[in-house]
């Protein structure tokens, strides 16, 4: 009995415990599901959410504007089949590769099979999204300097046609960038401008140009040359427009008042065009190409290219004051983020009129004219002096030749009748007469030269020389008379005369050319000495013959 009662008591206890547990569990489940049913969330989602860590909500990432980078190629880049163009595009492409997307690179160039293939390969190698636009070179009929503007119009017409939204910037292939520049360029909402430094390798100078600002609003444009330290204001949008030139070396400012820029006046005088502005230092919103009234489309019927887009951008840069801002905000040139490398092609140097020559005043022209006359007069006098000396030498030579010709002619005239009348008995007399004639002619030839001799020693020395000549001739005649036979006298005498005349002529030829007024006496004495020497040389073989006879 006791065992049965105990088992019943245990069963009751367990039953009560199970009932109590079930009631508590049911109440707990009901209490937990009641608020979830009120919010409409499922129990599974609420349970999963209860186990997730709490994370602060991140703000949405703003969408960046598209950068439209336009690069025009130089017309002379095709001369080397596009090799220099390929190098420049590769360098710029790797710079743009570091810019945060989205970015579209538009490259414009003339149609050329080789150059186009090189350019496309270079663009593909940079892994930058690009579009390569070409145009027929024969369609461009303007001056060579306007072809760059024509290429810019090609790119702007493409952007306008396809309505590409973004910020347009003209990037030269030889430009160097600071990557912070592209971050500020994306913030453009109208027109932006910034300072740019142009480094010239040929002139070894740096030209700085950019906008002038007033509270981040662009009010004008200036240019500054490092070589002259002169700052020139190209245009100013204030009411009293002035063109200012400032020389930093002398701290002097020269100001010239100009006419104020007026929109109506600019429309009437549209042919003059807006002031020249470096388009590489300007950026603008592309939506202005189809939203603004200035960009009314006037296409070329053959090419579909709007020829007025680039000029409209320049005009808009001047007139739209509310939409312009500077980069950086204060337009300070102390922070330059864009450099342009000016690398001109090496061409043969052609002499051109320098600005100094073109700007010579009347006083400078008179001075240069006087200097030219001073240089011409001495040269003319020197030329006249040389001509006079040559004429005197020529006259002396001519007179001397005439004297020799007369001597020879007289000798021949005497020999001709004498030879015909000579007999064996008269040969001696004719020989003596011929010798006397030779001596007489020599004396006649010496007569004008004796006039130049001094009264003292010159006359005595000349007489002694003549006496020696006569003595030598007499000695020669004596020897010849004894040794010559009747048949040989005539032949030897003729040969001797021919030799004397030939030797005199040979000596006179080089001496005539070098005769001057002061040298006449010396050359005459040398000639006489040579005659005596030749006569002595002739006597030597004749004396040998005489001894043998």
From Swiss-Prot:
State which ranges are Lumenal (membrane side): 38-549
* GO BP field: cell wall organization; glucuronoxylan biosynthetic process; plant-type secondary cell wall biogenesis
Q: Where is this region: Disordered?
A: 232-252, 350-371, 413-432, 441-524
Q: Which residues lie on this side of the membrane: Cytoplasmic?
A: 1-16
The enzyme class is transferase
**Function according to Swiss-Prot or TrEMBL:** Involved in the synthesis of glucuronoxylan hemicellulose in secondary cell walls.
Protein name (Swiss-Prot/TrEMBL): Probable glucuronosyltransferase Os01g0157700
Please report the organism this UniProt entry assigns to the protein. Oryza sativa subsp. japonica
The taxonomy runs:
Eukaryota, Viridiplantae, Streptophyta, Embryophyta, Tracheophyta
């Amino acid at each position: 009995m006791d065992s049965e009662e105990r088992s019943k008591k245990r069963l009751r206890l367990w039953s009560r415990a199970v009932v109590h547990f079930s009631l508590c569990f049911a109440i707990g489940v009901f209490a937990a599901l009641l608020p979830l049913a009120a919010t409409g969330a499922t129990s599974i989602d609420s349970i999963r959410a209860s186990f997730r860590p709490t994370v602060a909500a991140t703000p949405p990432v703003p969408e960046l504007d598209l950068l439209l980078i336009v690069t025009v190629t130089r017309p002379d880049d095709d001369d080397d089949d596009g090799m220099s163009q390929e190098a420049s595009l590769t360098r710029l492409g790797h710079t743009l590769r570091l810019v945060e997307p989205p970015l579209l690179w538009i490259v414009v160039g003339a149609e050329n099979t080789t150059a186009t293939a090189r350019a496309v390969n270079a663009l593909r190698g940079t892994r930058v999204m690009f579009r390569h636009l070409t145009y027929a070179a024969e369609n461009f009929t303007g001056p060579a300097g306007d072809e760059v503007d024509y290429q810019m119009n090609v790119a702007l017409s493409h952007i306008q046609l396809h309505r590409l939204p973004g910020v347009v910037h003209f990037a030269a292939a030889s430009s160097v960038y600071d990557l912070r520049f592209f971050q500020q360029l994306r913030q453009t909402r109208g027109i932006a401008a910034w300072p740019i430094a142009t480094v010239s390798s040929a002139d070894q100078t740096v030209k700085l140009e950019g906008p002038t600002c007033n509270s981040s609003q662009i009010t004008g444009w200036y240019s500054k040359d490092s070589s002259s330290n002169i700052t020139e204001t190209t245009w100013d949008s204030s009411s009293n427009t002035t063109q200012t030139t400032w020389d930093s070396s002398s701290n002097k400012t020269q100001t010239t008042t100009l006419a104020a820029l007026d929109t109506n006046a600019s429309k009437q005088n549209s042919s003059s065009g807006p002031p020249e502005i470096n388009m590489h230092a300007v950026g603008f919103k592309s939506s202005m190409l189809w939203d603004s009234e200035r960009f009314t489309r006037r296409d070329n019927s053959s090419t579909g290219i709007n020829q007025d887009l680039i000029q409209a951008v320049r005009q808009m840069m001047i007139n739209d004051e509310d939409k312009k801002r500077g980069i950086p905000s204060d337009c300070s040139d102390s922070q330059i983020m864009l450099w342009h490398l000016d690398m001109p092609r090496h061409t043969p140097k052609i002499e051109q009129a320098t600005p100094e020559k073109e700007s010579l005043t009347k006083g400078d022209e008179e001075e240069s004219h006087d200097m030219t006359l001073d240089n011409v007069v001495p040269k003319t006098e020197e030329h006249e002096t040389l001509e006079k000396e040559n004429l005197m030498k020529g006259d002396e030579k001519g007179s001397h030749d005439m004297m020799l010709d007369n001597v020879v002619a007289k000798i021949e005239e005497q020999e001709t009748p004498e030879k015909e009348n000579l007999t064996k008995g008269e040969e001696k007399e004719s020989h003596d007469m011929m010798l006397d004639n030779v001596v007489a002619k020599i004396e006649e030839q010496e007569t004008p030269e004796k006039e130049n001799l001094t009264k003292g020693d010159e006359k005595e020395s000349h007489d002694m020389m003549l006496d020696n000549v006569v003595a030598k001739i007499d000695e020669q005649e004596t020897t010849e008379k004894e040794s010559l036979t009747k048949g040989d006298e005539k032949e030897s005498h003729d040969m001797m005369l021919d030799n004397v005349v030939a030797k005199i002529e040979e000596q006179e030829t080089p001496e005539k050319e070098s005769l001057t007024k002061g040298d006449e006496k010396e050359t005459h004495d040398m000639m006489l000495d040579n005659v005596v020497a030749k006569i002595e040389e002739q006597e030597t073989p004749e004396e040998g013959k005489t001894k043998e006879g």
